[in-house]
Structures are given as structure tokens and as C-alpha cells.
Amino acid sequence: KDIGLFRTSGPRHLAFAGITAYSLYKWYDNHRYCSHCGNRLVRHDKERMLYCEKCNNTEYPKIMTAVIIAVTNGNKILLSKYANREYTRYALLAGFTEIGESVEETVKREVMEEVGLHVKNLRYYKSQPWSFSDTL
């Protein structure tokens, strides 16, 4: 099931619909039983949610928050080259938000961990869903 073709197929709204549908398919397929009591989960008919008729547990798709960071100094931008990874090109700094951490704290921690710099003048640019890895 190679869904990578959605990255380059168009029009974009159809590609987005295909990626979203595949992500939901994976989620429904991987969440069949209640994590509390083991009973079979039921799909809700009005929202993207599964529920347990036995213990009333509800489950929603989980989205992992991630950040991509452009560290700049004037007209210069800091790129990183990850060691010991399959991806060998230069890239912006990035990482996942940990439990109890704000997105701003994630940015500061990731920059410190990856390149040892303190972040100043933090500015938000925009968000983008990334359904291939269930991240935002």
C-alpha cells in the first residue's frame, strides 16, 4: 500500500482527501478493541470516534504534535545533517512535543538538544497536517 503517490498527485484537495481517508482507515483497523475492558469498539455515526458499549470508553484518533524549526540569523538559516540516519541530506531542525510540554517549549528544547543554541524571538509561522505519520 504505497500512499506516497498522494504527495505528488493532484488536484491537491483530492490528494488530501485520499491521505486523510488512508489515515482513518489505518486508525480504525488498529483500534478494534477497548483499551479498558477488551470489548469490541463501535464506530460513532456522527464523529470520528470509537466507543465501547460495555464500559462507555471513547477513543479518538491521536495526533502527535511535531515542530519543524527554522533557526535564522539575518539572511542565514541553520540546517542540520542527521548522523546515523537513512536521510542524509541537510534539513531544518525538528522534533516531537513531549507530554506536558507546549509547542514553544518543544522548539526551545529541540534547538538546544540538536545544536546547543538558546532560542530568542520565537515566531510561529503556520501548521500543516502530516497524515503519513499522524502528526501536526
Model regions and ranges:
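N-terminal phosphate-binding loop and adjacent alpha-helix
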Residues: 102-103
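N-terminal strand-loop-strand
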Residues: 46-92, 96, 118, 123-124
